[in-house]
């Protein structure tokens, strides 16, 4: 994808603020293997981080700022990891020996966890595909995390703690989704929807 776009693979070769490569989601629970390739990695849950990040980007871009000054400012957002601001040294066996941060860069970097899903940012307008897709319905998240705690499950571990939306919020957002998209079906999304404590009133 980067090659087709004419965007250099390595972060150090991208000098413009227009060519940022940003990563997020479950793969960033171990961000170091792709640290040379991304400019920014969101650690944790990105809905609220992304809003702050985009607002900051717009401000810096409007002022004609350079990439490095923007990245230093972005690193101050909780859960935003900017690999170029850190130096990692390794033991002979390949394990991490030390992580050193540039002046002003936070260490350790704490992942961002949304405390209240009822008040968290939730987009009202979704892109609807113009062709038939496998999951041809709206998707509404009912809770995050999982009460099971299975040791083999990465998602069950990294999305802790368990947080539920109230059934009233789920119902309201589901109605908005149907109105905005034209879908008549909704998927109630979570790691284990049958464990949602408010399933009956919903």
Sequence positions of predicted segments:
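Ferredoxin-type iron-sulfur electron-transfer modules and their immediate structural context
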Residues: 82-137
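Sequence-level detector for tyrosine residue identity
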Residues: 10, 57-60, 81, 86, ...
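Glycine-rich beta-alpha loop elements in corrinoid/cobalamin-binding modules
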Residues: 1-100
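Residue-identity detector for glutamine
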Residues: 49-55, 68, 76, 110, ...
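Radical SAM [4Fe-4S] cluster-binding motif and immediate context
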Residues: 115, 119-202
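Generic detector of short, locally flexible boundary/turn motifs and exposed helical patches
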Residues: 5-10, 16, 102-109, 116-118, ...
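Short coil/turn linker and secondary-structure boundary residues
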Residues: 29, 45, 65, 112-115, ...
